[in-house]
Amino acid sequence: MGRGEFLAMKTEENAANLINSDMNEFVAAAKKLVKDVGMLGGVGFGTSVLQWAASIFAIYLLILDRTNWKTKMLTTLLVPYIFFTLPSVIFQFFSGDFGKWIALIAIIVRLFFPKEFPEWLEIPVALILIVVVSPSLIAWTLRESWVGAVICLVIACYLFHEHIKASGGFKNSFTQKNGISNTIGIVALLVYPVWTIFFHIF
């Protein structure tokens, strides 16, 4: 074998090695990309599920406080919590004409027929009014950011503290027949903001 043939074979071997190395790196990068996309998709799905759950539990607590199981919990704080956790599709629906009609009818009834306006409707109507009149900075920017999650976390922590105090201690809040329903609901309120803040930081 001549020197020229040896050099040609060596060059082809080096080229093949480089191609194989590049292919291996490409495959590894593709696998990492698929893994990262899957993780992000999982996080996004988990966030959406927890957001729905947070809204449902907040509404549940709002209804529960209007029944015979009334507590000393400040349920008006659930209004801003629901505002910040309400899923976008529902928020957009109520911020449109449907919500405006409800707000208009409620205001007219409240002004001209105050005795006919039920007390239990005041908080839901207040929530719809806030959704309708909130500026875009609050309605879309803050709601979708970590700021909204921090506000929800502060509200949930305060409600949990007040509920424990009203129940006569941490143990009683989990053992009393009426208190445990509120306790489970309030603990559920903590999950979504903690999850959201964690993934905003990390």
From Swiss-Prot:
Pfam families: WCOR413 (PF05562). Residues 1-42, 94-97, 141-145 are extracellular. The chain crosses the membrane at residues 43-63, 73-93, 98-118, 120-140, 146-166, 182-202. The keyword Cell membrane applies. Keywords: Cell membrane, Membrane, Transmembrane, Transmembrane helix. It comes from the Eukaryota. Residues 64-72, 119, 167-181 are cytoplasmic. One of its GO terms (biological process) is response to glucose. It is a multi-pass membrane protein. Belongs to the Cold-regulated 413 protein family. This is Cold-regulated 413 plasma membrane protein 4.
